[in-house]
């Protein structure tokens, strides 16, 4: 049978104490509101005593303190214990008064102090020794008659703890007044504990000056009740003299003898007439189940505190009960239970429970969870400490002084004992008397001294008073000054608040509010900036408007010609034409598109799938009479727009805009209106300045740029296998708006947001809705060409595309398809755009799209110049994820490439943003607000032409990307090599290069920073180091494999710890390196660890790249690592299959690393991406990382700090590089290498992975410990060979030897004769460069020289092999591709004009255009005669000393012939340099000086004339090409046949000559050229054949 327990404890069998009678098991519900016996509290608190009655215990003596009141009175005492004020002087008197609510089966518990003061100590104290849990000897089991008068011994004064606990002692020492004061003090403590103020009446009651009103009423009620009790007792004294003794025995008997009986009420104590009372609620507010109803002896039938007191005039219910049961009522008060026996009973039960609990805890099962087992062990150890605690408590209590108790503290003399005086004490008394006299004398003197001191103090006080008066005056003046300072501070705060408000409005782009605040402040600089902004934006607005007007005029001309051609074709009954004027061919892409048709009578329009295909249009129109082809409406104006040419531009633009705003396919007008309203609202919201400008009555810059807007609600039907996201549709709508408004732009979405898909969507949308079928030219990096092809195949398979790449033969095979025009998109790379411009530039491209457009950030780069010079593409779009990498001119270069008519001058653009106050003469330094204002106006300028969205803004579903920089240690080999390279710029060797093998040597290397980076990555990147170590470690072939690969490098050792963990948890890795030689070492390491990997670097072919991507991305791919170079593999690749990116060494340009990271962190990634950037501690890599972080911080501001501070020079940049190489104090605290646990936290995505990684580390350490030949993870110094461990003096000696050998040679050893002079003359070398056989020609010349010598080497073959192996000398130059014939001809014409110009006596020096035309026939002095060829260096040495770059016309003509000039600008530079050299060397006013000025102007005039001719020629070419395009198919075929016949007849003729012959017939200004027509034809023939061979 288990005892009842509380919900938190475990049930256990009933107690069985050792010897002596055992109490029976406790049956039924818990006997009272307290905790049940089995709980922890039951062990500490009171134990149930003898059988309890069924109603609560009455208060003895008086009913003034019911049980609930006692419980509430105990709360402040708990607060006293909690607040730590137990040592207070009133605490002792309060502790005995406040009692816990009594257990129904026993008396109220008391503190040990109270027990001690009552003259007894518990023989078995509580195990925990808590004062509030010590049991009281007074039991609630046996009731006390309530009629006991207060005068009798044992009468109880309410609230007296001593009287309550000791009924047999005398009257209490407390008077009623003291008790009232004590209650008031308890109430005061209670209120103070709650933080409440004390009322005045309570304060007086605490001091004993007045009693509380409630207490006075209680006194009166108490007196009345005592009188009633005395009367009742006197009435019952006579008949009740004898029965008390059996009743007392009957009450004590259960407590002393019968332990086996249950603790419920006994039958001899119960009566049938006792009413059942509800149990008193527990302190927690939860009522305990009521015990069973039981009869009660008459003496115990006193009502509890819950029964209301009867009025004085009515008989008490107690009297009525006693009258009914008068036959068994005792005559006098029955004696109470013996408290000692009750205490013993409680202790027995506690010991039995403890013993049973210990036994139960010792026998716990082994399958318990760890946390429960820990709790059980703690409990078992606590129970075993019980006897020790008991002994300790007894010793402590025995040593307590009795005068600390409440009773003895009040009467301190009660316990004094008289003491006999002895002789020794008498002597001591005399001694003390003498000391007393001495002390009195000392006090007298002290008093006199104090008197003197008081006089002096008065003097001090007098002075202090007057000083304080002066201080008050000072304080007053200081307060006035403080008031003024506070006022000034408040004004300053107000100014700052206004500035913050201004900044807030500026950041929120509230321009109207910002301008108002500027006007209030009267800030001249900010007002000037705003004025500049308005002027510049107004200027740009005008430029945009003019650009759009010019484009619209060109479009009108084309439309007019097309319309005219269409009418002619309609009259001649020609075949149907496409929208661009060309005839529709069944094999062309247009034949698959639906053509919109309309019914002539009903006006019904068929479009989309219902409309007929272009190839079946004629047959469909015959089968469906009444239909005709509907006029096009989207991008072109209707026929009425062509006819009304004099109509105002504004109205036509509004009509066009309305035409696009209102959806032509919707049927209800209300829908149209609603859409128009929404579109207008959208424009207002989208444009950050439209509201302000409309308020001022002018039109917004953005609104002017995007005047024609078109709503794009869904993607094209040609775009299949996927749906565009919302932000991608917005990007498509923005690009369509650029198309509609004849503008170009930059799509600069962050990497990974699908710029490729948006571009394909634009192409398909234009093909479907605008009938613009191309051709589209897409220029991409080689690494992404395969990805673009894959995306086109996936998203737009119906688009005909050509991948223009491969060998020259492969590219040549694509030319017929290019000429036929049966394609939509041409994909090619930057290199082929430059190389094959003579083929690709002949096609008139409709759209040019450049991927990774930041490649064109240099305006003078070859790609930009070739595209601008040779290619015709009116519409252009740049795609880039990083539009602003470094400086402002790079951004201008992009904008100038897109919109040259708007962004003309770089200097104006840069000056406007860099030095806004340069013209005003003020300081140029900008504060934060001015900087932000400039950034805002840059945004304002870029807004119509640049669209950029970030991942965090548009793609919230994308998982997180977390980057960690992991510091790596160096091996001993790395540290030594790094130290010497950093200090001296030398690399230690084993001396084999000087035939001192094993003795050591040093090799000086250039580009120290690069060598330091290589040492940080891996020391075996230096081949001689690896070969020497391979010999030292016993490896053959000079190649090291196995564990020594990662022991030599700290980064490799870190990878050796990380990669196995990532493979075990199925995390796939992209590993980016900067150096391909490092990738080779990495491959050896992967082979050692059996990691399956793929490698992609700059040498990987384009077709192989697509296969590698496919292998890695396929679902069940077995490849764990993809090894990529940062530059080749970091652009445009989709590698979402990996979720871990390791950047082995950081790039100087942080955007390269960001591009690399985003190969994995892009749309489609499902897992969290971890980027681990490895960095060697205390090395150059930390400086590179810091520089990269600085650049990234700059990029976040859009404009970097260098744009506003133009003070940095090349000297400062050199100093910065030098600072990187200087020694710095090592800061080991900052550069802590992470331990395994930190590393695991970085790479683990979940808690389970972290635990697995920790176990793997433990297994690795155990395995290393078991290995008898174990070595440390990193190479240590004692493993290094002797030649590498050198002290600084020896390294200095080796360095000096190296320098001496460079200067003096190697001493006695005969040096090999090496001829360092050029074996070839300059002509031979140039010819060899052209032919591409430089090495063979050099080798031939050397062999000829060698044959001439008498002492021929015995083994020349060996030397040849050695030389061929080393390939010393000038590297083979790449053969230059020839310029277009047209450009070469123009250059020759200009130079010949300048050379042949002759001076006439009757003409001014500076020629006009008319003079240039007739100068061929003029006679006079030829000005260029002196400039044709310069004198030699021997003839005129001073010229070559003064002029650094000499040049003459002969050299210029040679360069034209060798295609050194790529544009007329390059030619102009050399001609201007020639004239400038002449002006520098010759005196001003001399003949040559004046001739050079004339030749400058002649050159410029000739170039202008050539440019005008080119423009007129282009216009005529455009007209002819359009006419050719609009001819019928049969005519086109016949033209092709004629061209082929002409080619056969004129084998060497240029293929475009037949076309251009009519142009030559036109009258145009003739530039004099002394070459005859035959010579020109021969030159054109040779150039044409050259291009054909290409």
Curated annotation (Swiss-Prot):
Q: What is the effect of changing residue 932 to T?
A: Found in a patient with non-specific intellectual disability syndrome; likely pathogenic
Domain called QLQ: residue spans = 173-208
Q: Where is the composition biased (Pro residues)?
A: 10-36, 101-111, 143-152, 278-295, 305-315
Q: Where is the HSA domain?
A: 436-508
Task: Report the transmembrane regions from the record.
Answer: none
| Compositional bias annotation for Low complexity | 37-46, 216-240, 262-275
Span of domain Helicase ATP-binding: 736-901
For this chain, the Swiss-Prot or TrEMBL PTM comment says:
During apoptosis, cleaved by cathepsin CTSG to produce a 160 kDa cleavage product which localizes to the cytosol.
Q: What is the E.C. number? A: 3.6.4.-
Subcellular location, principal: nucleus
Q: Which reaction does it catalyse?
A: ATP + H2O = ADP + phosphate + H(+)
Acidic residues biased stretches: 636-650, 1510-1529, 1570-1590
Sequence ranges assigned to domain Bromo in this UniProt record: 1378-1506
N6-acetyllysine PTM positions read 190, 604, 997, 999
Keywords, A to Z, come to:
Acetylation, Activator, Bromodomain, Disease variant, DNA-binding, Hydrolase, Hypotrichosis, Intellectual disability, Isopeptide bond, Neurogenesis, Nucleus, Phosphoprotein, Schizophrenia, Transcription, Transcription regulation, Ubl conjugation
Where is this chain compositionally biased, Basic and acidic residues type?
651-661, 1352-1363, 1542-1551
For the motif DEGH box, what are the positions?
Answer: 851-854
Q: Where is the composition biased (Polar residues)?
A: 319-329
Q: Which cellular component appears as one GO term in the record?
A: intracellular membrane-bounded organelle
Provide the disease association from the record. Nicolaides-Baraitser syndrome: A rare disorder characterized by severe intellectual disability with absent or limited speech, seizures, short stature, sparse hair, typical facial characteristics, brachydactyly, prominent finger joints and broad distal phalanges. Some of the features are progressive with time. Blepharophimosis-impaired intellectual development syndrome: An autosomal dominant congenital syndrome characterized by blepharophimosis, facial dysmorphism, global development delay, delayed motor skills, impaired intellectual development with poor or absent speech, and behavioral abnormalities in some patients. Additional variable features include distal skeletal anomalies, feeding difficulties with poor growth, respiratory infections, and hypotonia with peripheral spasticity.
Q: What family does this belong to?
A: Belongs to the SNF2/RAD54 helicase family.
Oligomeric state and interaction partners are given as: Component of the multiprotein chromatin-remodeling complexes SWI/SNF: SWI/SNF-A (BAF), SWI/SNF-B (PBAF) and related complexes. The canonical complex contains a catalytic subunit (either SMARCA4/BRG1/BAF190A or SMARCA2/BRM/BAF190B, mutually exclusive) and at least SMARCE1, ACTL6A/BAF53, SMARCC1/BAF155, SMARCC2/BAF170, and SMARCB1/SNF5/BAF47. Other subunits specific to each of the complexes may also be present permitting several possible combinations developmentally and tissue specific.
What function does the entry list? ATPase involved in transcriptional activation and repression of select genes by chromatin remodeling (alteration of DNA-nucleosome topology). Component of SWI/SNF chromatin remodeling complexes that carry out key enzymatic activities, changing chromatin structure by altering DNA-histone contacts within a nucleosome in an ATP-dependent manner. Binds DNA non-specifically. Belongs to the neural progenitors-specific chromatin remodeling complex (npBAF complex) and the neuron-specific chromatin remodeling complex (nBAF complex).
According to UniProt, the name of this protein is: SWI/SNF-related matrix-associated actin-dependent regulator of chromatin subfamily A member 2
